[in-house]
UniProtKB/Swiss-Prot annotation:
Start and end residues of each stretch annotated as Disordered: 352-383
Glycosylation sites: N23, N33
GN (gene name): Nipal2
Family in the record: Belongs to the NIPA family.
Protein name: NIPA-like protein 2
InterPro entries reported for this sequence: Mg_trans_NIPA
Subcellular location field: Membrane
Keywords for the protein's UniProt record, in alphabetical order: Glycoprotein, Membrane, Transmembrane, Transmembrane helix
SUPFAM superfamilies noted in UniProt: Multidrug resistance efflux transporter EmrE
Membrane topology: Multi-pass membrane protein
GO MF entry, a single one: magnesium ion transmembrane transporter activity
């Protein structure tokens, strides 16, 4: 009777090790790989394809943002700059942005939200690398540490995200759409959104947490609708027509409307705060909201082991920390000298620096010394 009791813990430990082996082995089957890794690869091929689409899409977005940034810098150096929206370079950046977002859109159709949403950190780290290589920005120690943490977090996310394969059909979306879990979630989200919107509009509260929470609440609806629309389009392409169902167009309207208002609040945040503050906070809020939406609407973590969930959340934490380190203190350096250099103006010979307006404080007057200055001038005139 004692022997079976001793072997039970060994069986449990063996099962845990087998699960870890399946999670940590994601390359193609080969001579050195066992049957577990081969089965894991075949079972998760479509997820890995979604991961590849998301990573490539985020990298393309990084390239597009740096191209647009370079076009702005290039136009600023011209004597008579034309509007940026007429620049071929800037327009090519916009097209690349659309291409990258298309990759993300397709990724949501073939992989879980909880796997694709956190991969947005690749856009931030990729943008930092491109800025160093092509825009000659400084590479800091915090950048290297942040990139390392982001890559480590991505590795854990890919391995420990929920291994579920869902065919997102119109009937499936309808079933989840009227489920009590989603209805409770939507009611709570609407209440929080209305309260924050009241304080934002009526009380003039423009704190970054308020603005980006509004963005995150809308983003949860965006990722739910994006996955539904993308999944139904994917099934329709394979021959199972889903575009005749009303739920497809309902989700399409939700996707467009949530995106529009999301951009509106995000623009308000970028106008009031620096990008080094907005980018990491928005990444954390958006990813958290998307993960919660995927868990509640699509039930992506249903039946997952505690260890798997814990390591997945730890991977999210590493990616969040990496984004904060990469974007930390990346504000533009401002010139400390208050003068205008005439050396680059055609037909003008530079003799000295032109001082600022004599009425300004930087001209040498004290903030409260206007009366004393005028008094001294008056004494000189009387004498």
């Amino acid at each position: 009777m004692a022997a079976p009791a001793r072997t039970a813990p060994e069986d449990d430990a063996s099962a845990v090790l087998d699960e870890l082996s399946r999670n940590f082995t994601y390359w193609a089957p080969g001579p050195g790989n066992g049957s577990l890794s081969s089965a894991w690869y075949r079972r998760n091929q479509i997820h890995l394809f979604g991961v590849l689409l998301a990573i490539l899409g985020n990298l393309v977005i990084s390239i597009s943002l740096n191209i647009q940034k370079y076009s702005h810098l290039h136009l600023a150096q011209k004597e008579h700059p034309k509007p940026y929206f007429k620049s071929v370079l800037w327009l090519s950046g916009v097209l690349l942005t659309a291409l990258g977002e298309t990759g993300n859109f397709a990724a949501y159709g073939v992989a879980p939200i909880t796997l694709i949403a956190p991969l947005g950190c690749m856009s931030v780290t990729g943008s930092a690398i491109i800025s160093v290589l092509f825009l000659k920005e400084n590479l800091r120690a915090s950048d290297l540490l942040g990139m390392t943490l982001a890559f480590a977090g991505t590795y854990l996310l890919v391995n420990f995200a929920p291994n579920i394969t869902q065919a997102i059909s119109a009937r499936t979306v309808q079933y989840y759409f009227v489920g009590w879990q989603f209805l409770v979630y939507v009611i709570l989200e609407i209440l929080v959104f209305c309260i924050l919107l009241y304080f934002h509009k009526r009380k003039g509260m423009k704190h970054i947490v308020v603005l980006l929470t509004l963005v995150a609440l809308l983003a949860s609806l965006t990722v739910i609708s994006v996955k539904a629309v993308s999944g139904m389009i994917t099934l329709s392409v394979t021959g199972k027509m889903q575009l005749t169902y009303a739920i497809f167009y309902i989700m399409l309207v939700i996707m467009i409307a949530s995106c529009v208002f999301q951009v509106k609040f995000l623009n308000q945040a970028t106008e009031l705060y620096t990008m080094t503050t907005v980018v990491p906070v928005n990444h954390v809020f958006f990813t958290t909201s998307a993960i919660i939406a995927g868990i509640i609407f699509y039930q992506e973590f249903l039946g997952a082991a505690f260890l798997t969930v814990f390591i997945y959340l730890f991977g999210c934490f590493l990616s969040f920390l990496g984004v904060f380190l990469v974007t930390r203190n990346r504000e533009k350096e401002h010139l400390q000298q208050s003068f205008v250099d005439l050396g680059d103006i055609p037909g003008k010979q530079m003799l000295d620096k032109v001082q600022p307006d004599s009425n300004g404080l930087s001209y040498g007057t004290l903030p409260d010394g206007g009366d004393s200055t005028r008094g001294q001038c008056g004494e000189k005139k009387e004498s």
